[in-house]
Amino acid sequence: MVDPLALRLANTIRATSSGLTDAFATPESTREWLQTNAAHLGTRMDLDDYLPSEADRAALVELRQNVRAVFAEYVSPQPPSSADAAVLPPFPEALTALNNATAPTQRLLGWGRSGPRTLERVLTADDLDTVMAGLADATVEFFTGPVASQIRTCPAPRCVRYFLKSHPRQEWCSVACGNRARAARHYAQHRED
């Protein structure tokens, strides 16, 4: 199963043995991620010839941080991902920024007492704005769709990912994270002895 676009965007930060890796760290890596996900972006922009400027890359990073803030709000009271919990924008600001990014599309994410819901609006924009709108719209669709209730934060040591819980006994985003968590638990138990 391919993860929804909103989840892939949120998980462009990942933990490796050498620390955090950011898929948007450079214009080249940003272009590679956009090209990989082009079919899901809802844009006619030619991504093969596109190398994001530093401003474009920064705008995509900001959008990702806003999306991660919405993920963090959604999983609460479960703790958010440890990658950026301290540097995420406040939820109301993130929600406004996410909705503003949807401008060329027709969907907005509304948040009421019962949680997320879809609202509509129509505007126009340039190529990068349509890419960002595709990402923002995918996020709105994700949080107002049926799979949002399955979103979890991976509790494994050093993991910073969100994942969809596809099985009642699933606790981690991957087998590797499960192994790392069990090894850490085993080490902690034997260290106390």
Predicted regions and their residues:
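Cys/His/Pro-rich metal-binding microdomains
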Residues: 155-160, 174
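Alpha-helical elements of the RecA-like P-loop NTPase motor core of helicases
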Residues: 8, 181-184
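Short helix-coil boundary/hinge micro-motifs
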Residues: 1-153, 161-162
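Cysteine-rich micro-motifs
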Residues: 168-178
